[in-house]
């Protein structure tokens, strides 16, 4: 607790002398020991393991920019649930041009009667991200070669797209990579036939790869 200037009352404030002492020790260190974070490791647990106190948990964020920017890695046993919660919708892939149709917020219905709301569309991948109202969307919008669509209320005309692929969002393709791990664009309106040299990376795989990087 500290008094600041002539202000009445006291305020909670971190003990900066403790922080400065640790920062100086880190800055004066000539070497660092590498450690791979294991499932179940927490900052306070590792602080106690290395320093004999839980007080220095924040040093891991200080000296590891990737953790500071992206957060502590998720335990492996929690990762799938985290992925489903982060990407809970359905992904529909179509070769039809959706750039001007299927606006975000539009209600759409497939041949099998499943209805949902367009949350996002990615025309360069031919993808519609649709929320069917379930907490974790498990009800599919139908098999391939069926259609999903809506009625344009201005023109009073039906707008449809043929389903090439449909899956849970977390299992759908986030991007394609070449052999150098670089993102590669697909040929427009031929989204189901990527070059054989390209590797598809799903939302789930991307999160798992990112999580592994945070452990180092």
Could you tell me what each predicted segment is?
Residues 1-216:
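Cell-surface/extracellular proteins and modules involved
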């Amino acid at each position: 607790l500290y008094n600041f200037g002539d202000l009445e009352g006291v305020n909670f404030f971190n003990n900066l002398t403790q922080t400065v002492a640790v920062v100086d020790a880190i800055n004066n260190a000539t070497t660092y020991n590498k450690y791979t974070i294991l499932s179940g490791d927490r900052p306070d647990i590792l602080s106690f393991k290395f320093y004999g106190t839980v007080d220095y948990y924040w040093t891991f964020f200080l000296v590891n920019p990737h953790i500071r920017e992206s957060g502590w890695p998720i335990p492996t046993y929690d990762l799938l649930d985290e992925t489903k919660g982060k990407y809970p919708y359905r992904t529909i892939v179509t070769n039809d041009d959706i750039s001007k149709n299927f606006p975000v917020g539009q209600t759409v219905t497939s041949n099998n009667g499943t209805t949902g709301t367009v949350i996002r569309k990615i025309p360069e991948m031919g993808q519609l991200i649709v929320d069917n109202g379930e907490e974790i969307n498990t009800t599919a919008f139908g098999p391939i070669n069926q259609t999903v669509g809506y009625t344009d209320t201005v023109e009073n005309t039906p707008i449809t797209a043929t389903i090439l692929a449909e899956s849970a969002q977390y299992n759908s393709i986030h991007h394609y990579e070449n052999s150098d791990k670089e993102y590669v664009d697909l040929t427009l309106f031929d989204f189901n036939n990527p070059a054989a040299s390209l590797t598809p990376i799903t939302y789930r795989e991307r999160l798992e790869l990112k999580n592994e990087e945070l452990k180092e």
